[in-house]
Amino acid sequence: MKRRLLFLFAVFMVGASVGWGQMIPTYYKVAVGTDGDGSSAGSPIYKTNLETALSDAALSSLDSVIILLPEGVYSANAAPYFITKSSLAIIGEGDTSTVTIKSPVDIGLTNGGNVSFQKVHLTAKTSTGRGVVDIKSSKTTVSF
């Protein structure tokens, strides 16, 4: 009986640890065409522009959001996008010189967390000297 209980406990621990560390993010992919949703976990939700992807990221039920940007030049409304997630990544799918965000984007992470920009070229389009990305949060890690 003791061995069986110990064996069941070991099986439970292994089963719990396998799923414990897996965090399936919400993937958004900006693409030409109509909006659509991912048909399975890990498949992207297609959005027609960066602004729509950022707006929907704030509404995602999952705690991690990844926005994939194909080669091109992107802009979004400077209105704040309040994203209450632990992780937000904006990733360019092309070379850094071919994925550009030109307009100011305000990201509000109300719960802190991590913001990551990968393979994306950020350029300011305003004449006010304002930065391209304004992240309003405390205890936040930002990586480029």
What residue spans do the PLM features occupy?
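Glycine-rich repeat segments that build the extracellular carbohydrate-interaction surface of secreted
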Residues: 28-34, 53-76, 87-94
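Right-handed parallel beta-helix/beta-spiral solenoid domain characteristic of secreted/periplasmic
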Residues: 75, 86-134
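Right-handed parallel beta-helix/beta-solenoid
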Residues: 18-52, 73
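Bacterial N-terminal signal peptides
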Residues: 8-16
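Flexible, charged surface loops at secondary-structure boundaries
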Residues: 58-63, 83-84, 109-111, 136
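Short, intrinsically disordered, charge-balanced linker/junction segments flanking boundaries
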Residues: 141-144
